[in-house]
Regions:
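Glycine-rich phosphate/adenosyl-contacting loop at the front of the ribokinase-like
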Residues: 1-93, 97, 276, 356-379
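Conserved beta-alpha-beta core of the PfkB/ribokinase-like small-molecule kinase fold
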Residues: 156-232, 256-257
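Short beta-strand scaffold segments in enzyme catalytic cores
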Residues: 115-119, 127, 257-261
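Cofactor-binding loop segments of dinucleotide-utilizing enzymes, especially the Rossmann-like FAD-
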Residues: 18-20, 80-84, 107, 120-122, ...
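Well-ordered beta-strand positions
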Residues: 14, 104, 207-208, 248
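Conserved phosphate-binding/catalytic region of the ribokinase-like
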Residues: 1-19, 194-195, 222-379
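Beta-strand->loop->alpha-helix junctions that form or flank phosphate-binding loops
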Residues: 79-84, 102-113, 190, 250-253
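Conserved phosphate-binding/catalytic loop of the ribokinase/pfkB sugar-kinase fold
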Residues: 103-109, 118-159, 164
């Protein structure tokens, strides 16, 4: 199986993360207009699997980095809480099968596994509603403490993933730990969390910040509810990162592609023209692809490049790998594409006219699957 090779010098060898672990259902709404505050609307219950953020990001990282392969492969440790229910057991098994080490995921005796309802419009866009009283909210400082020796041992070679669907206060504690140990701190925030995250100083504890257009507008805009043009957001992000040289930003522009910004400079990577099956999980797939590229030691962006079409791209940056992964992800009805694998991504890129650079090929290798005996058991 083709995977990316983690790079100890100039890249990363493991990821430890907190965020939502759970599952949900998807509805395809009838009609293009946005769901109203007091509206009841028919929708088709889809035969599609929805998942929560840490699971999605962790799955793609584990698959693309070959975490279920040789013992020296990239390690992924999620930290979280699920319910003692069928959904929790199923999610645990799926994450373990993808190659994640589940020793820091525990079950709660009374609270249910995090669940969500995703709704999709006919054009493939949509949103979701996620339970706020699930087992995920029971994540505690003790859970972080249990994983802290691994964070300390990894040091600057470790990625600290900090994504939504767990309390902001715990995310602050996690980022403080990551800062103490020199981890590379990767964050995303839901739209409704941006102001509180700013107030709590979480942005200043971030090395890589991934936002969609609405979330970036809340961070960089002039007034609440205003959604800025993606080009303008990239300009403002460039000004922000010029003053914060440690901060990198990913700004998704939806079906158009994504921007990567660092040190006052940016790159725009266009996405292939597609009719998406579902955009659920696409932003998480984008983030995961970028993290994988950085772990393999390829550049985050090619500064001041702006591709006109995906078909003309020679893929060589972490941003471009992220856009490729996100684009591939929307060809599935599921929030995690069941066929996510590096060789499939490369074939998809070539099918849509892009090519893989020699520098990207050079950080890939064929890896052998490890024994199932090394997979943690659910307790």
């Amino acid at each position: 199986m083709l995977t990316l090779r983690p790079k100890a010098e100039g890249g990363f060898t493991c990821a430890i993360g907190i965020g939502g672990i759970g599952a949900g259902i998807m509805y395809a709404l009838a009609g293009e207009h946005e769901l109203g505050r007091n509206e009841s609307r028919l929708g088709e219950l889809l035969d599609a699997r929805d998942y929560c953020k840490l699971h999605i990001v962790g799955h793609y990282i584990a698959r693309l980095m070959g975490s279920d392969r040789a013992p020296e492969s990239f390690r992924v440790w999620p930290i979280g809480v699920v319910g003692e229910d069928a959904v929790g057991r199923q999610i645990f098994a799926e994450m373990s099968a993808a190659g994640m080490d589940m020793q820091f995921v525990r079950s709660h005796p009374t609270l249910k596994t995090l669940s969500s309802v995703c709704f999709i419009y006919p054009d493939g866009s949509g949103g979701n509603i996620t339970s706020s009283n699930s087992a995920a909210q029971a994540l505690s400082v003790d859970d972080l403490t249990a994983a802290s020796p691994y964070m300390k041992a990894a040091g600057a070679r470790g990625v600290a993933l900090c994504v939504p669907e767990v309390p902001l206060e715990l995310r602050r504690d996690f980022l403080d730990l990551a800062s103490d140990y020199g981890s590379y701190r990767v964050c995303s925030f839901a739209l409704g969390e941006i102001e509180e995250a700013k107030r709590m100083g979480l942005i200043s504890l971030t090395d890589l910040l991934a936002l969609n257009q609405e979330e970036a507008s809340a961070l960089l805009g002039d007034s609440p509810g205003q959604v800025l043009d993606a080009d303008l957001l990239a300009e403002r992000a460039a000004r922000l990162t010029a003053n914060r040289p440690q901060l990198r930003m990913i700004i998704s522009a939806g079906r158009k592609g994504a921007y990567g910004v660092e040190c006052g400079k940016s790159q725009f990577c266009p996405a292939p023209v597609l009719q998406p099956m579902s955009t659920a999980g696409a932003g998480d797939a984008l983030l995961a692809g970028v993290v994988c590229g950085l772990a393999a030691g390829i550049p985050f962006i090619a500064p001041n490049e702006s591709g006109r079409s995906f078909s003309s791209q020679v893929l060589r940056t972490a941003l471009e790998l992220g856009v490729l992964n996100a684009s591939f992800s929307v060809t599935s009805t599921h929030a995690i594409h069941p066929d996510a694998a590096l060789q499939n991504l490369f074939a998809f890129a070539e099918l849509h006219g892009a090519s893989i650079s020699e520098s990207l090929w050079s950080v890939c290798h064929e890896s052998m699957r490890i024994s199932a005996d090394n997979v943690s058991s659910f307790t």
